Amino acid sequence: MTLLLFNILTVYTFTTIKNLQSDLLAGKTTCAQLVEESIKAIESKKHLNAFLEVFSDSAIAQAKLVDEKIKSKTAGKLAGVIIGLKDNICYKGHKVSCSSKILEGFESLYSSTVVERLLAQDAIIIGRLNCDEFAMGSSNENSAFGKVLNPLNEKTVPGGSSGGSAVAVAANLCHVTLGSDTGGSIRQPASFTGTVGLKPTYGRISRWGLIAYASSFDQIGPITKTVEDSALLLEIMAGKDEYDTTASQKEVGDYTTSLNDKKTFKIAYLKECVESNGLDTEVKKHTLDSLDKLKQSGHTVEGVDFPYLDFLVPTYYVLTTAEASSNLSRFDGVHFGYRSPNATDLESTYKKSRSEGFGKEVKRRIMLGTFVLSAGYYDAYYSKAQKVRNKIRQKTREILSQYDFIVTPSTPGTAFEFGKNSEDPIKMYLEDIFTVQANIVGCPAISVPNGIHSNGLPIGLQIMGRDFEEGNLLNLANQI
């Protein structure tokens, strides 16, 4: 590890990217100083296990380049912004493992589109962040490299699968991070750590360079301290991409400019969500209080029926495991990644490498996905789940044709203690009951902080919007 050779007189306090840019131009801090502070913060809070690796050398080199650009007034919109990457996003010349033994030591051969776009605006990539293995989990207990601790209460989980990304922001280890969201993997950890987590519309941000879990659900997004920073990052990362045919051709909005426009909206909340037996009473109260405040601010707020709540989680897990069983078939011990030393022939190489390389939860989902795609059960499970997905899409879009937004709690409760749900897969899966809807449908959704529970942990509020209307979504989120 390369260390800088100057002393920091005062540690810089990060608030927003906009303020950071002003302070860099005014000479109140430098990119080199910011990188050193970040490296020291990560080291001092190493026990949180948020970072799997710190890219010290490349970050320091980038900081020096950006400092020169600032002096010559040619720096980009993210000059000096220190960003952490979830360990399933590729950065050329750097390791990426999806927090799995099967990819341990694998080095990216190219950079993801999002990384290229961030670097083009002079961002500084500081390292890769721990997550649930192959983004499969809701607690960050499934990583092959150890669990991540919630800095707000180290006995509790940070959420998953982007737990390391949320913790890095909440614990001030870096300024902002990227995660991926397949069923709530950005929004749930954001809720558990008191940060802002944005899942854009499916296709708004290119998935090129994101190691796939479930291709029709996955979406990259930011975790930040403020809605303003999420808006700026989305503006920079969004847009068409020749390497990803699912990336939308739609024009990218000016999300930061429209953020503070005074707008009033028509908002729906799902009655079944706020009346759910599994919803914590304080989470319910905070949700209803926020809806009342929105009403008092001039917004129209009405409850609507959503009869498919109980079908969300089963539909999600049938379809995502099916896609995962296909996507993860490439990790076979032959092409790249872990190869079992105990294999004697090609067949045993496949079997032993996958059995030894994948963790318990990943193997569970691969087996479930293979089962629902098998000839005897395809119609009974996979085909039926696709039909239910269409029903959920139709109903959600019907609501969004009459209302601008759908508001729900982000999660049924606050961060839970380690081990509480890990032996009960169904109970763990139900942690995603409010977040999976946006991925099933493909619409954008954001989790914003919504007060503190009596147990001292943060509560999140989720807002879902119409496809590609992130400008309005961010505007409302900024009002809360």
Where are these regions (language model features)?
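Flexible, glycine/charged-enriched surface loops at secondary-structure junctions
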Residues: A50, L78, E242-S248, G298-P307, ...
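Short glycine/serine-rich loop/turn segments
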Residues: A79-I220, L270-E272, A322, T408-I426
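Short, conserved phosphate/pyrophosphate- and ester-handling motifs at nucleotide-, phospho-/glycolipid
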Residues: G27, K86, T226
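Glycine-rich, small-residue loops and helix-cap segments
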Residues: G27, S38, G80, C174, ...
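Conserved hydrophobic/aromatic pocket- or pore-lining residues that grip, position, or stack substrates
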Residues: S38, A59, K86, L118, ...
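Structural helix-boundary/capping segments
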Residues: S44, A171-T177, T182-N277, L288-S297, ...
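An N-terminal boundary/leader segment
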Residues: M1-K64, D289, Q296-G298, F371
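Immediate post-signal peptide segment of exported/extracytoplasmic ligand-binding proteins
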Residues: V66-I82, D229, L259-A268
